[in-house]
């Protein structure tokens, strides 16, 4: 169980995705969402290698937060075209200054980009924060703006204990499902991109 009680008030504050969620007290979320080069550097290298990204590629991060992944991608491929979108004005305003100009506030359910604009669209631990109907729309939007690949990660459980842990700890998830339920949901949503838990 959480060290601090998960009250309606705590959840409501976390779901604003503002200072309290990213950089405030741990009971509201991250407790300090800071850049960790060791983590993001490896993730960016893995994405570059797996999706064969190069300096001519275009990448969109849906739910980019402060843009740490895009920053690392740009460091590794300086001419890569990057864009990020996040629902949090706070996160965008507090993004890495080197890439802030590539980020905007917006919603995953209505991406302001043309069809087939990106070689890769990523969404890292974001989409489970939407209710199923909006989640289905976000998956359709990711598919629409991707001309080639998409990759999402989200929270999923494998057993009752993991489910209980998610229910105790996750403050912002609107959709909690088992891995098998997610797979079925992706099929029903006509999502054919890559995913990981």
Go through each PLM region and give its residues.
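Class I (Rossmann-like) S-adenosyl-L-methionine-dependent methyltransferase catalytic domain
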Residues: 1-51, 56-112, 130-137, 141, ...
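Conserved acidic residues
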Residues: 119
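A conserved beta-strand element that flanks and buttresses the S-adenosyl-L-methionine
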Residues: 122
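Short catalytic micro-motifs in class I SAM-dependent methyltransferases
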Residues: 125-129
């Amino acid at each position: 169980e959480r060290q601090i009680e998960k009250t309606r008030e705590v959840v409501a504050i976390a779901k604003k995705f503002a200072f309290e969620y990213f950089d405030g007290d741990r009971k509201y979320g991250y407790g300090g969402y800071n850049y960790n080069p060791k983590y993001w550097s490896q993730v960016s290298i893995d994405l570059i290698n797996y999706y064969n990204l190069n300096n001519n590629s275009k990448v969109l991060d849906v739910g980019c937060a402060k843009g740490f992944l895009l920053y690392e991608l740009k460091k590794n491929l300086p001419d890569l075209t990057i864009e990020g979108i996040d629902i949090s004005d706070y996160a965008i305003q507090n993004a890495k200054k080197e890439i802030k100009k590539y980020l905007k506030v917006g919603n995953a359910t209505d991406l302001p980009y043309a069809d087939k604009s990106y070689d890769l669209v990523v969404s890292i631990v974001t989409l489970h924060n939407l209710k199923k109907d909006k989640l289905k729309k976000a998956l359709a939007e990711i598919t629409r703006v991707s001309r080639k690949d998409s990759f999402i990660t989200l929270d999923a459980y494998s057993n009752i204990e993991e489910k209980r842990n998610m229910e105790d700890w996750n403050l912002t998830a609107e959709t909690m499902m088992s891995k098998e339920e997610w797979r079925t949901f992706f099929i029903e949503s006509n999502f054919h991109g890559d995913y990981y838990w």
